[in-house]
C-alpha cells in the first residue's frame, strides 16, 4: 500500500494575515499614544496640585 500525504490549506490568504497584523499594529500605536497623553496629563495635574493629591491619597488610606 502506498501512503499519500494530503496537504490542506489554512483557509486564509497571507494578505488577510498581513492586513490584520497591520491593523493590530495601528491599534497598538494608537493606544500607546493615548496612554502617553493620559500620563502627561496626570503629570501636569500632579505638578500643579501635588500637595492636594498626597493629602487626598493619605485620607483614603493609600488605597
Curated annotation (Swiss-Prot):
GO BP terms: modification-dependent protein catabolic process; proteasomal protein catabolic process; protein pupylation
Disulphide connectivity of cysteines: none
Region (ARC ATPase binding): 20-57
Region (Disordered): 1-36
Pathway the protein contributes to: Protein degradation; proteasomal Pup-dependent pathway
Post-translational modification comment from the UniProt entry: Is modified by deamidation of its C-terminal glutamine to glutamate by the deamidase Dop, a prerequisite to the subsequent pupylation process.
Chain coiled-coil ranges: 23-51
Signal peptide feature range: none
PTM-bearing positions, type Deamidated glutamine: 63
Biased composition annotated in UniProt, kind: Basic and acidic residues: 1-11
Keywords from the named record: Coiled coil, Isopeptide bond, Ubl conjugation pathway
Any one Gene Ontology molecular-function term assigned to this protein's record: protein tag activity
Numbered residues of crosslink Isoglutamyl lysine isopeptide (Gln-Lys) (interchain with K-? in acceptor proteins): 63
Complex and partners: Strongly interacts with the proteasome-associated ATPase ARC through a hydrophobic interface; the interacting region of Pup lies in its C-terminal half. There is one Pup binding site per ARC hexamer ring.
Similarity annotation: Belongs to the prokaryotic ubiquitin-like protein family.
Domain comment as written in the entry: The N-terminal unstructured half of Pup provides a signal required to initiate unfolding and degradation by the proteasome but is not needed for pupylation, while the C-terminal helical half of Pup interacts with ARC to target proteins to the proteasome.
Job description of the protein: Protein modifier that is covalently attached to lysine residues of substrate proteins, thereby targeting them for proteasomal degradation. The tagging system is termed pupylation.
Protein name per its UniProtKB record: Prokaryotic ubiquitin-like protein Pup
Organism of provenance: Mycobacterium leprae (strain TN)
Amino acid at each position: 500500500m502506498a501512503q499519500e500525504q494530503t496537504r490542506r490549506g489554512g483557509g486564509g490568504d497571507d494578505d488577510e494575515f498581513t492586513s490584520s497584523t497591520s491593523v493590530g499594529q495601528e491599534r497598538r500605536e494608537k493606544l500607546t499614544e493615548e496612554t502617553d497623553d493620559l500620563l502627561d496629563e496626570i503629570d501636569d495635574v500632579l505638578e500643579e496640585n501635588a500637595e492636594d493629591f498626597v493629602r487626598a491619597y493619605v485620607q483614603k488610606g493609600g488605597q
